[in-house]
């Protein structure tokens, strides 16, 4: 089963991912995007460049995702592992959809169309919901993807994705304390996963 953690920068999802990884290691593969591969490193360089071309950046993200799927996610699923990924395809749709909003019409649909041949849909997505101002303040707005105005557009895209497949998403209030958010995530996974897969 493929579980993804999604949310705005500053939502605390990586803190949750780290907590889950520290307490669940038997039969669970923990991974993240961007990856540590050469493709993921190229993504990180692009993220920090204010003048990066948004179309080129989309294809960097897509290449990293395709490599991640073939090298990590699919083999782990084939072994019968639960895979928990800190960011996955929905991040691409929400973030690159916002980045390209002034470049191509129906930007999020454009991104999904490019990305979907190279992905495998998640089974469960925990969405850590936080308002854009809080997300920007927590993250420190260290790059172009972390300003409150940009995150507002990203959040609107996430809401649209939730409307598309509401049965896949579990919304978690990320304005709570880290301990409460982690507890909610643990409870959501206990509900979503078979007993023998999550103990």
UniProtKB/Swiss-Prot annotation:
Belongs to the thymidylate kinase family. This is Probable thymidylate kinase. Its EC number is 2.7.4.9. ATP binds at residues 7-14. One of its GO terms (molecular function) is dTMP kinase activity. PANTHER family: THYMIDYLATE KINASE (PTHR10344), UMP-CMP KINASE 2, MITOCHONDRIAL (PTHR10344:SF4). CDD domains: TMPK. GO terms for biological process: dTDP biosynthetic process; dTTP biosynthetic process; dUDP biosynthetic process. Keywords: ATP-binding, Kinase, Nucleotide biosynthesis, Nucleotide-binding, Transferase. The gene is tmk. It holds the Pfam family Thymidylate_kin.
């Amino acid at each position: 089963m493929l579980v993804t953690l999604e949310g705005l920068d500053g939502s605390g999802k990586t803190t949750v991912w780290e907590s889950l990884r520290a307490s669940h290691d038997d039969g669970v593969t923990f991974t993240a995007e961007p990856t540590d591969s050469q493709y993921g490193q190229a993504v990180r360089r692009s993220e920090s460049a204010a003048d990066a071309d948004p179309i080129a950046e989309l294809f960097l993200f897509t290449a990293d995702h395709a490599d991640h799927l073939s090298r990590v996610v699919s083999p782990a699923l084939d072994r019968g592992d639960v895979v928990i990924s800190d960011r996955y395809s929905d991040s691409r749709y929400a973030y690159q959809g916002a980045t390209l909003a002034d470049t191509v019409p129906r930007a999020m649909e454009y991104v999904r169309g490019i990305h979907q041949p190279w992905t495998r849909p998640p089974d469960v997505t925990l969405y850590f919901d936080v308002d854009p101002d809080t997300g920007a303040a927590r993250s420190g707005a260290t790059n172009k993807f972390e300003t409150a105005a940009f995150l507002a557009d990203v959040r609107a895209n996430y809401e649209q994705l939730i409307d598309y497949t509401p049965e896949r998403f579990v919304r978690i209030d990320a304005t709570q304390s880290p301990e409460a958010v982690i507890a909610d995530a643990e409870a959501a996974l206990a509900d979503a996963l078979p007993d023998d897969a999550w103990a």
